Amino acid sequence: MRVRATARVEAVAPERGERLIQFLRAYKSAVQEIVNELWCLKKTPSNATLHRAYYDRLRGRGFRAHHVSEIYKRAREVVRATKSNAGSRPLLKKLTARIHPLDYKIDLKAKALWLAVLNDGWIELKLKWYDYLDKYLNGSWRLGEVLVSYKHGRVFA
C-alpha cells in the first residue's frame, strides 16, 4: 500500500534568499513562456514533443536537466487544466518550483535542505523543525519531489 503525505516546513535561506528568489523567478518565467506558446495550439503536445522543443533552450538558460522536464510538464498541466475548464490564458503569479529528488539533498539530523539552482549552483536552506515532523521524517519514509515556494518574504518547502 502506498501512502502520500505532505509536510510543509518553513525554511531560512542564506543572504536573504536572493539566489533562491532569482531561481524561482527564472523557473516561473520559463513555465509562463511555455504556457504562452502552448496556449496558441489546438492540441497540447506530448511530453516527448515538448522535450524536443524546449530542452536545449532551457538548458542554455542554466537549468538542470530535471528542472527542465519539470518546467515543461508543469506548463502542460496548467494549459490542459485551464482549457478543460474553458478558462482564459493562465498567468502564473506564485514563485513556486517543483524540485526533482535528484536535485535536492536533505540532512534530517542537521535539519538542512540543499537545492540545485541555476548554473549548477547549490543553496542551503535551514529548516524550521516542528516536533510532529519527527513522526514522518525519521528516515523510514522515502521522500519524493519537493515544492519550494516564496511568499511574503518567507520560504516554504
Where are these regions (language model features)?
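Nucleic-acid substrate recognition interfaces
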Residues: 1-157
